[in-house]
Amino acid sequence: MDLVIIGLCGQSVFPSVDHFHRPEETLHAHDLFAEPGGKGYNQAVAAARMGANVAFAGAVGPDADGEACAKRLEEEGIVPLMAVKDGRTAFAAILTDRRGENRVTVYAGVQLSAQDIDALEAQIASAKLLLLTPEIPEPAFARAMELAARHGVRVVINPAPYVRWVEPYLADAWCLTPNRSEACAMLGCREEELEARLACAPHPRMLVTLGGEGALCVQEGTMVKIPARPVVPVDTTGAGDCLNGALCARLLAGDTLLEAAKKAVLAASLSVTRAHVLDAMPLEAEVMG
């Protein structure tokens, strides 16, 4: 596989509500949808739909949710590299309001270990790109970084959620893809200072996502603003995952970082015009056409 993604996977449920909870308020959902998910899992589907050859590695329990995760990957043409472990598969509840905004609660479930990553060495060694997020435990993350370095594999780190333990690994990534708040946490600045700090950021390549405003592509001190396509959002859940998967797919297709970033921003713009996550990921023909 050209792209290996290691991340969290589990079952996701999507209740749709008119507005988010006020204190002590009980809400009644007017719609309910369920599908497998997780940041890395979503990124894998996005990359595969953009034409990449993808393998996804995650941990699941010996339960129906774990089986559903593997089955959907196969349906999307993705190679599932699942570690089946004692315990429950991860679970997420994504509440979406009528504006398309969301609130997410995650139960992490069973977790990958460093030993699980060791079992993936052959797949990592043969990959051209490795995509990681710190939603997996640090020992597994560290071992994946070590194996990528050993075999000369480029690593893209999507530092979401941003946690302090990820900081020592950022310098070894080929590219970082934080959102605005994660970039501010990385650089120790306020949002209004972000662009000035990015101009002298220590990392040579960053793609900072700005939600509906698009993204900032930073290379060797040069910064380019990439506007998002103007759309009416239906559901913003998974837009960042879409962008990361599409970015990696286009890098593997031979695009420069800036070229890949422009197409990734377009893919993310298209994704928010549709409900839910996996079904919202655009196909390569939609983005390239």
Which role fits each region the language model picked out?
Residues M1-A59, A64-A68, P233:
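Glycine-rich phosphate/adenosyl-contacting loop at the front of the ribokinase-like
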Residues M1-C9, K71-V84, T96-M223, L283:
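Ribokinase/PfkB-type carbohydrate-kinase core domain
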Residues L3-V4, R164, P168, E191-G289:
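Conserved phosphate-binding/catalytic region of the ribokinase-like
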Residues H21-A29, T177-N179, V224-P227:
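Short glycine/proline- and charge-enriched loop/turn segments
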Residues A44, A148, A183, A260, ...:
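Small-residue (primarily alanine) positions within well-ordered alpha-helices
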Residues A48-R49, A149, L252:
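Gly/Ala-rich phosphate-binding loop of Rossmann-like dinucleotide-binding domains
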Residues A57, T105, I226-P227:
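Hydrophobic residues at beta-strand termini and immediately following loops
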